[in-house]
Amino acid sequence: MRFQATLLASTIYLRFCDVKSEFFILNISEALAISLDATVQSVAATIAGLRYFAMAMTGSSKQEGVLQLTPTDNVLVALKDLRKGEHLTFSGAAYTLATDVPAKHKFATVPLAPGNDVIMYGVLVGKAMRPILQGEVLTPLNLHHQAAPFHEKTMEYSWTPPDVSRWRNTTFRGYHRADGQVGTRNYWLVVPLVFCENRNIAVLRQAFEEELGFAAPQIYRQQVAEFVRLYQAGRSNEIAGHGAVAADARPPAPRVFENVDGIKFLNHEGGCGGTREDSDNLCALIAGYIHHPNVAGATVLSLGCQHSQVAILLEQIKKRDAKFSKPLLVFEQQHSGSELAMMSEAIRKTFVRLMEMNENCRRAPAPLSKLCVGLKCGGSDGFSGISANPAIGHVSDIVAALGGRTILSEFPELCGVEQELIDRSTRREVGDRFIQLMRDYAARAKAVRSGFDMNPSPGNIRDGLVTDAMKSAGAAKKGGTSPVTAVLDYPEYSTEPGLNLQCTPGNDVECVTAQVGAGANVVLFTTGLGTPTGNPVAPVVKISTNSALARRMADIVDFDTGPIIDGEVTIEQMGEAILEKVIAVANGQVRTKAEALGQNDFIPWKRGVSL
C-alpha cells in the first residue's frame, strides 16, 4: 500500500503523572512532509522514529509517577516503584496496576493478546507471548523480541540543526598533527603485533611508567604492605578487622616530560592462530591507533613469524595516511638476537623519541570541528534512553553542526531502528551499506545459534530493558537527529564530518576500542548500572543515567544526567553542559575518572574462529 502523507502538527511529547494528577510537559508541533511506501503502522513508526522526543520538565515532574515517550506507545515507564493495586489516572484514562512495577520497567496500557505488538518510542519493541493485562509489568515471561523490517532509503531527510552560534568560535587547546588531525592527549604508544610479545610489553611498562612519573597510584599495594607489617609485628589478629583502603594522600610522582601525557602499553590475545581476516583486522586496528591524533609515535614489538606481519601493519598505516611521518620504532625478536639486546635497544630509542616529543609537541587552539566523539552506552538501564542517551545525542547534533565527527556503533543495539537511520542517510549508497552490514552481522550471529535478540544482559533485563528492540530504541538516541553521513565497517577509520555509523559489537570494551581505532579523540559513555570502562588513548567520559548511580559510584562517574529524570533540566540544557565538559577534557584541564584510575581497556574484536 502506498501513502502520500503530509503530516502537520506532528506531536512528540512526554507526559508525566502521579496517582492524583496529570502533567503535560511538552508538546512540539512542526510540519513534516514525507513520501514513503509502508503500511499505516510502519508510517507511524517511521515518523515517530524520525523525531526524537525532547524534555522540558517543570517542577511538577519531580513528583514520582510514570512516563509516556510517544503518543502511539501502548506502555508507560515507571519512574518509581509502583505496587499492585495502585490506581493511576493518565491522559484521561484510569489504570489499576495488575502487578508490581519496579522503577524503570514498563506496564501495558491496554490488554494485549498473544502476538499483539508492543510499541515504545513509537516503534515495535516486542510481541506479547501470552495474554497481558492492562497494568501488568512487561517481563521476558510475557514479551519476546520483535523488530520492524527495514528496506532501502525511500525518502529525503530534512534536518534542522541546533543553534550553534555560541560555539562557532569556541576552541580547545589540542595537539596538532602533520595530517591535520588534532589530539586531545599526547601519548607514546607501545604495542605488540602478536600475543607472544605481551610479556615484553609488560617489562617495558615496568621500566618506563614508575621512572617517568606515569604510574597510577598503588593504593592496594600499600594495603598489602600494611598487612605484611602487621603480620611481621605479630599483630595479624588486626588484619581481619582492618578497614577499607584509603585513597592515596601522597602527591603523584613528578613527570619527567611535561608535554607528554603518558606512555600507553597495549596488550591483546591476537595476531596469530586465528583467521587471516582477524590478523589483518588487528593490523588495521593498530594502524588506526598509531594514526590517531592522540598518539605522537609508537614502539611496535613483533615476534616475526606470526600472521600479523609488519608489512601488513605498514600497508594499513599508509591507507590511513599516505604521507605518514610520525616516528615508528619496530623491533622483531626473531631477528634481534637476545631478548636483552632487543629490549635495551627498544628502551633507548623510545626514550630518545620521548625527549623529542616533549620538545616539539605543544597544545594550541583548535576549532570544535576537530573533535571526533565516540557515542557509547554500557550497563544500560530503563532510564538510559530517557536521560543520558538523548542528552549525548544533542551533543552529537551540535558537533555535527559545527563540522565535527561523531561515531555511533553497537550494531546489535540498533536492531529495530534501522529504517530511521537508513532514511537519515545522506546518500542511497550510505543506507545500502548499513543494510548490508546489519544483515551480514545478523547472519553471522544466527550461524552460531545466537542472534541480536540475545543481546540484553541480565543487568539490562533487571533494570527494565526486556528485549533487544526495546534496548536498541533507547540506545539509538545517542545518535541525535543529524543525517548519517558515513557507514564504517570494522576497523575502518572515520574521515567524513557528521554522524558516522560503525559496525561493532555491543561489548563495552570491544566497541570503545573500535571507536578510538576509528579516530574518536573523546568518548561519551552512558551507563545506568555503572561500568569502569576506559581506553588507553582517548579519554572516556562516563555519564550516569540516574543520580543514585552517580552518588553510589562517584569514583567512576564523571557526569550525572539524573536531573533530567528529576525534572530539573531539559535534555538540551544537559547536552550543552556535557559539551562544556567535553571541551574541558579535550583541553587537558580535566582528567576523566577512567584516566585517573588507569583504566586502559583494549580488546580487539575477533570475528573469526581460532584455528
Where is each model-derived feature located?
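Extreme N-terminal basic, low-complexity initiation segments
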Residues: 2-8
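Secretory-pathway ectodomains
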Residues: 28-31, 122
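Short, Lys/Arg-enriched N-terminal segments with co-localized hydrophobic residues
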Residues: 45-55
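Metallocofactor- and cofactor-centric catalytic cores in central/energy metabolism, strongly enriched
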Residues: 56-376, 380-484, 496-513, 519-522, ...
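Short acidic/histidine-rich active-site segments
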Residues: 526-531
